[in-house]
Amino acid sequence: MPTVNQLIRKPRVTPVKRNKVPALQSNPQKRGVCTRVYTTTPKKPNSALRKVAKVRLTSGFEVIGYIPGEGHNLQEHSVVMIRGGRVKDLPGVRYHIIRGLLDTQGVKNRKQRRSKYGAKRPK
């Protein structure tokens, strides 16, 4: 533990917090247009074809967004809303596309956690 004199000479420095979602510019969501919709493979222990889209945001950033859920209707020039939230096994994917909003349809036949996937309540 430093002495009072040592603290006067060299005060404590708080580490700088790095922004994990810079493209959102402190907004909860941002709108963008899909420039490319494709699949990619996850990191080492996992194996799948994960659906992702390259999105040009209204702020001018070009980011990669993950498309959650089973099946989607996105293609080039689709208008989407993006939120923060990385995908742990996909390097470079730090955003999620919001389902059931703008051009993105909700997940069909979804019974649980429907609000997360933009699915209406089944009759």
Swiss-Prot record:
The modification 3-methylthioaspartic acid is found at D89. SUPFAM superfamilies: Nucleic acid-binding proteins (SSF50249). One of its GO terms (biological process) is translation. The keyword Ribonucleoprotein applies. Keywords: Methylation, Ribonucleoprotein, Ribosomal protein, RNA-binding, rRNA-binding, tRNA-binding. With S4 and S5 plays an important role in translational accuracy. Interacts with and stabilizes bases of the 16S rRNA that are involved in tRNA selection in the A site and with the mRNA backbone. Located at the interface of the 30S and 50S subunits, it traverses the body of the 30S subunit contacting proteins on the other side and probably holding the rRNA structure together. The combined cluster of proteins S8, S12 and S17 appears to hold together the shoulder and platform of the 30S subunit. Part of the 30S ribosomal subunit. Contacts proteins S8 and S17. May interact with IF1 in the 30S initiation complex. This is Small ribosomal subunit protein uS12. It comes from Bartonella quintana (strain Toulouse).
